[in-house]
Amino acid sequence: MRKHRNSNVVRLWAAGQAACSHTNNLYSMEDGSLWSYNLKIGQRTPAGVCVVADYMAPYFQSQTTSCHVSRAKGYADMVMNPLVWETSPMSEKGNL
């Protein structure tokens, strides 16, 4: 897979395409999921709705993940509180 800048990874995710950053720390998959390291931070539904978990303060994971979330929020149709996200089927690996 071709490597992309983080800004392009989230843009391609929102467009429904798989993509990976040059460090492999931010990536989107063909199932519509968006990952920061091993943490699922977003899901694009089959209808094309982009949902992002707001893993920023006070639900901070890492500085890098906060940067990834910040970029993804620019393309999000919905931003979820991480407590809601974690109980949602969208947060599960391989879902949707």
Predicted regions and their residues:
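Terminal leader/tail segments of proteins
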Residues: 1-96
